[in-house]
Amino acid sequence: MFISPDWMCTQEEGILIMEQYDVIVIGAGVVGSAIARELSRYELKTAVLEKELDVATGNSSRNTGMLHGGFTYKLGTLRAQCSVEGNQEFDKVASELGVPFKRTGKLVVGFTEHDHQNILRFKANGEANGVKGMRMVDADEMHRIEPNAGGNFAMYVPSSGILDPFQYTIGLAENACHNGVHFYFGSRVTGIKQIAKDTPDMALLIKRNPSISGKEDLYEVTTERAIFLARWVINSAGAYANKIGQMMGYPHVPQYGCKGEYYVLDKKAGQFLKIPVYPAPNDQGGFVTHATPTVDGNILVGPDWYDTEGPEDYANQKQSLDKLFTDGKKMFPKMARPYFIRNFVGIRWRNCNPITKEALDFRIDTNAGIPHTISLVGIESPGVTAATPLARRVAAILL
């Protein structure tokens, strides 16, 4: 992964004063990397600042690795639009990047009449969203598709698939890098300041770094290592998007953290499951524990969901893991404890109604009072599926 070897900067009191960029993207998760790749198509000088030492160290890699169909998301929302678009184009994207992907399809299984009605409701919603090919199947057909699925009936979603979200993010970032984007790791953003042209602050900036023209307003983005300058700043900081957004001048967006735990099953179990098996959505359209094969031959069982306050609260809880076993066995009856080889945690930061906690849509915010800034907040599931369509929307604002 490229980290600019020649930072072309001046140094003052131990702080590196960077060259000027057209665009700075904050965050090298899957969405930030997709934005960087999209912007690399244009004649823009772009940098990505990431607080960790590699891409996708946060929740971009702490998920099921599912290419979602888009049938549970509310019609007309950004989440629904980008999920369906991202799904439809993913074969092409995966081929361009050379990353592993299998369009396996997915079974959404049910046990009760209530499950059946919920599945039918979300099937109709998916069709309205543009999801193609969904069909209801009885137990016999369900077991022809996946012999080891639990359930009495199912909806088959042929457009769903599986991928490695870490390799996918690496592919996006490497492609951006090959096209000239600079990635700076270990670069935690500590401050963002707008500097107007023809002001004392701009004069001081030019004095510190004479390569700056000073003919247009700039943003000074300070990290623990250096000061970066750019005409545009894009916030794609994931769990820290609210914090970065407030540094930029955006108001706080009400959110809650939703923590989910997973079991990873040995590849010996992988031979028994070739297609993801999900439970019927609940009344709100959310899923609980499901069983999903990985592109490497393991199986992921999870997640459960409970609230958390910590953006990096990745500790497991025994009671949650016990529940995963019980719930996961309903989806995948061949699951057994000897297959468990490790566990991990992911966290969704959901935009929500501050009173009811109703989950709200993805946000791509702009503000006329903070020109040349874009703030993406609450990009949780299906963020991996939606990453490239989100990136196109960001580029359309900027260009």
Give the residues covered by each predicted segment.
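Active-site substrate-recognition segment that forms the wall
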Residues: 37-38, 97-102, 227, 235-371
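Glycine-rich phosphate/pyrophosphate-binding beta-alpha loops
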Residues: 72, 160-162, 282, 286, ...
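Glycine-rich FAD pyrophosphate-binding loop
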Residues: 41-61
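Helical element adjacent to the flavin cofactor pocket in flavoenzyme catalytic cores
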Residues: 155-231, 388
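Dinucleotide-binding Rossmann-like beta1-alpha1 core, especially the glycine-rich loop
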Residues: 65-145, 151, 288-290
